Amino acid sequence: MKRLNKLVLGIIFLFLVISITAGCGIGKEAKIKKSFEKTLSMYPIKNLEDLYEKRRLFVMTKFDKNDKGTWIIGSEMATQNKGEALKVKGMVLYMNRNTKTTKGYYYVNAIKNDKDGRPQENEKRYPVKMVDNKIIPTKEIKDKNIKKEIENFKFFVQYGNFKDLSKYKDGDISYNPEVPSYSAKYQLTNDDYNVKQLRKRYDIPTNKAPKLLLKGTGNLKGSSVGYKDIEFTFVEKKEENIYFSDGLIFKPSEDK
């Protein structure tokens, strides 16, 4: 009888441990989602100039009282076929809310390891500005393909939509309070709205559905310095990678 009681107590204890552990995981997942909601709720912003009127949604660091801040937007697509260089194309814009001016650059990069295994980059940048929600090169570009890519470029923030974020379940959750840093990874399907939008705009050489990674640093309450990035990973292997990354950051302006 005593053995039976001990066995029952052991099972109850094990059940409690599993329940508490699962509960902590769910709690962290909910907090990570909530920390991203303030940023992702802004998607999509079809007219980027609307960001001139948007104030910071969470405190990242102390701002000068005369500084309205600067938005930094970045989107890039990277593909690497087996045995080839990692080819990256993307754009970064700096939107100064004080001067209501936007400048940045479009970039093309090919990264390949040398004989010693060290990555060698070959990045080319093309300076741009934005006027009336249009991206315009600030220097002459002889390559017609690059010029067209710049003119047709759209940031993920302009077409992405995370209204179904709450429906993403059973994420792979990671949290390090020492840094602090956190992430949530979800397996998506090809029927996901954002996946369809990416396939519509990019030549993605795989039919595999991607994993969505939400990663950030700083306090989960969004009250400290940090960043938040979004990444869609279609393929992640040695010498073979396909991913899309996006970031929207608000920070103090360098020139007030």
UniProtKB/Swiss-Prot annotation:
Location of this chain's protein in the cell: Cell membrane
GO cellular component, one term: plasma membrane
Membrane topology of this protein: Lipid-anchor
Signal peptide: 1-23
Residues with a covalently attached lipid (S-diacylglycerol cysteine): C24
Record-linked InterPro entries: Csa, Csa_sf
Membrane spanning residue stretches: none
Gene3D superfamilies per UniProt: 2.50.20.40
Keywords carried by this UniProt record: Cell membrane, Lipoprotein, Membrane, Palmitate, Signal
Lipidation (N-palmitoyl cysteine): C24
Keyword Nucleus among record annotations: no
Similarity-based family: Belongs to the staphylococcal tandem lipoprotein family.
Protein name: Uncharacterized lipoprotein SACOL0081/SACOL0082
Organism of provenance: Staphylococcus aureus (strain COL)
Record lineage: Bacteria, Bacillati, Bacillota, Bacilli, Bacillales
